[in-house]
A protein has these predicted regions:
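Accessory alpha-helical/coil subdomains and C-terminal extensions
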Residues: 12-13, 22-24, 28-35, 55-166
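Acidic side chains
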Residues: 8, 16, 46-48, 63, ...
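Short acidic/polar capping segments at secondary-structure boundaries
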Residues: 16-18, 43-46, 90-93
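An alpha-helix initiation/capping motif
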Residues: 19-20, 39
Length: 166
């Protein structure tokens, strides 16, 4: 169909799968004696395309993840001793988790807190951010987080889906 429609260039906007498939298609056509140029624009929430500093979609995903967590962390006002784990995409790359944590901290800085209603900054803050690029000493973290739980009645964790897998 590409040949019939005289398509000789494809512009892709997407992540690994989109651009890998377009490149494979171009390679297949090249092996058949046909030319296809692929121009790929990276769009990935992982923000892990080198040398691109900021991929389309990454900052928006971080901002939306922060807003989502702002709604979820409100559960800390409903009862005591809450553990909230906000799992964020990022099997091999922690950029989105770290970016989401950063955006959430910006939101947190604009809040007013009422400690009498369990709305202290300590209860809404992030107590741990785990990403694949950093080793986790689980025994130390358990002790540290238990102390936070005892002091603040809650622990809030941002977890990249690939963290601690090694």
């Amino acid at each position: 169909q590409l040949e019939k429609d005289k398509v000789d260039i494809i512009h892709t906007i997407g992540g690994d799968d989109t651009n890998t498939m377009a490149a494979a298609l171009a390679e297949y056509l090249h092996s058949s004696g046909k030319a296809l140029t692929v121009v790929g624009l990276p769009k990935t929430v992982d923000n892990d395309v080198i040398p691109v500093k900021q991929t389309l979609g990454a900052l928006t995903a971080a901002e939306q993840g922060a807003l989502f967590f702002q709604n979820i962390v409100n559960e800390n006002t409903t009862s005591r001793r809450q553990l909230i784990i906000h799992e964020v995409m990022g099997r091999h790359c922690g950029w989105l988790t770290a970016g989401t944590a950063l955006e959430y901290r910006k939101l947190l800085g604009r809040k007013n807190f009422i400690p009498e209603l369990f709305m202290s900054k300590d209860r809404w803050d992030i107590h741990a951010v785990y990403i694949p690029e950093i080793q986790i000493d689980f025994s130390k973290e358990v002790k540290r987080l238990r102390k936070i739980m005892d002091e603040h009645d809650c622990v809030n964790i941002f977890l990249s889906e690939g963290a601690g897998m090694d």
